[in-house]
């Protein structure tokens, strides 16, 4: 038997700094210098023996904040694709971001040409001329965009909007009240005239607001619902409407609005080089400030699967930066990138800032 003083207590090893992991620089914290912008560099992923990367050829520079109101304005920005019929003042980001997808061979680091390896053929019963085959299938290429702060450290896709200034956006983001419950035939608290056995019931006006009771074979009165003039029920009997509130400090709504995804198009740049392009012509920001766009490219048609059967979608990111001015200040316009279709036999044509443009399906 040892005394308490005679017991041997092992001395814990000294705490080594090697056991403490260094802070990650992928997303800098408050103590990390913002000059470490490694997380803002474009990401190139390797898949199926190819290198995929994004090149923002036309950077978004500035725009006017569109706010939370429902003001009607004009679409004077660069429009590439047909927009839905709407009267909302989008005030899109200018110039619209134009992103080029660069696909390289992982072994030779040579850019893969997407020109057709066979001549174009005419589809029967159609007036469109399309490519019969190509080295790259762009049918399932999708580009998505998110709004981040100027340092690229946190998302700002949502913004809190004050409930004192209603708009269509806040009305759409509110929840609907629950459906009214079925009305019971009897209403407790209201006088329902019942008569004993042997006395005929009192017959009043059809719209008089008084119930009619009949006797069944068991001696219990059977009541029927009342009918009120105008088809309306008393306020105390109607189901209470649930008020829609935006919380103590307002409600959250989207800060980046518009078309947040784009499909791929085969276009020719001013150097007469065919490439895979993504055009984001309908992007608007509600609030004022300096932001970045996080652009991610995915191939939704990939057949690679993980062990649990979920499809693998590799993101390819780019971080263009732009600033938003107040709604009354008009930013100067800049000359857009001139893009055209690789074939003149296209049936669909649009205009990009007074410049002819054709689109191929």
Curated annotation (Swiss-Prot):
Residues 1-36, 308-340 are annotated as: Disordered. The gene is velB. Component of the velvet transcription factor complex that controls sexual/asexual developmental ratio in response to light, promoting sexual development in the darkness while stimulating asexual sporulation under illumination. The velvet complex acts as a global regulator for secondary metabolite gene expression. Component of the velB-VosA heterodimeric complex that plays a dual role in activating genes associated with spore maturation and repressing certain development-associated genes. Keywords: Cytoplasm, Nucleus, Sporulation, Transcription, Transcription regulation. Residues 323-336 have a biased composition (Low complexity). This is Velvet complex subunit B. It is found in: Nucleus; Cytoplasm. The keyword tRNA-binding does not apply. Residues 47-353 form the Velvet domain. One of its GO terms (biological process) is sporulation resulting in formation of a cellular spore. Component of the heterotrimeric velvet complex composed of laeA, veA and velB; VeA acting as a bridging protein between laeA and velB. Interacts with velA. Forms a heterodimeric complex with vosA; the formation of the velB-vosA complex is light-dependent. Interacts with vosA. Residues 23-35 have a biased composition (Polar residues). Disruption phenotype: Shows reduced conidiospore formation but does not affect penicillin production. InterPro entries: Velvet, Velvet_dom, Velvet_dom_sf. Belongs to the velvet family. VelB subfamily. GO terms for cellular component: cytoplasm; nucleus. Pfam families: Velvet (PF11754). The keyword Metal-binding does not apply. It comes from Penicillium rubens (strain ATCC 28089 / DSM 1075 / NRRL 1951 / Wisconsin 54-1255).
């Amino acid at each position: 038997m040892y005394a308490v003083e005679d017991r041997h207590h092992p001395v814990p090893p000294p705490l080594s700094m090697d056991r403490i992991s260094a802070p990650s620089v992928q997303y800098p914290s408050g103590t990390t210098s913002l000059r470490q912008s490694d997380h803002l560099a474009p990401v190139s992923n390797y898949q199926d023996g190819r290198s995929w990367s994004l090149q923002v050829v036309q950077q978004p520079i500035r725009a006017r904040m569109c706010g939370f109101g429902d003001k009607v304005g004009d679409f004077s920005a660069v429009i590439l694709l047909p927009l839905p019929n709407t009267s909302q003042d989008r005030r899109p980001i200018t110039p619209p971001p134009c992103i080029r997808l660069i696909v390289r061979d992982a072994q030779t680091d040579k850019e893969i040409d997407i020109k057709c390896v066979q001549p174009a053929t005419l589809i029967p019963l159609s007036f469109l001329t399309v490519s019969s085959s190509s080295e790259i299938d762009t049918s399932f290429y999708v580009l998505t965009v998110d709004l981040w702060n100027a340092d690229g450290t946190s998302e700002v896709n949502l913004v809190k909007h004050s409930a004192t200034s209603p708009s269509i956006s806040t009305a759409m983001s509110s929840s609907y009240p629950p459906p009214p419950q079925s009305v019971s035939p009897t209403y407790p608290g209201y006088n329902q005239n019942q008569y004993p056995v042997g006395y005929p019931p009192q017959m009043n006006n059809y719209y008089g607001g008084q119930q009619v009771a009949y006797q069944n074979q068991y001696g219990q009165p059977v009541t029927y619902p009342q009918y009120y003039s105008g088809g309306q029920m008393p306020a105390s009997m109607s189901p209470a409407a649930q008020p829609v509130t935006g919380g103590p400090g307002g409600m959250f709504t989207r800060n980046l609005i518009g078309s947040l995804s784009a499909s791929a198009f085969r276009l020719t740049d001013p150097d007469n080089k065919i490439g895979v392009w993504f055009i984001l012509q309908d992007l608007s920001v509600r609030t004022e400030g300096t932001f970045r766009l996080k652009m991610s490219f995915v191939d939704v048609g990939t057949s690679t699967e993980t062990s649990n059967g979920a499809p693998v979608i590799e993101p390819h990111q780019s971080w263009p930066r732009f600033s938003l001015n107040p709604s009354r200040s008009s930013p100067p316009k800049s000359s857009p990138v001139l893009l055209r279709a690789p074939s003149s036999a296209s049936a669909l044509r649009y205009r990009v800032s007074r410049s002819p443009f054709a689109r191929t399906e």
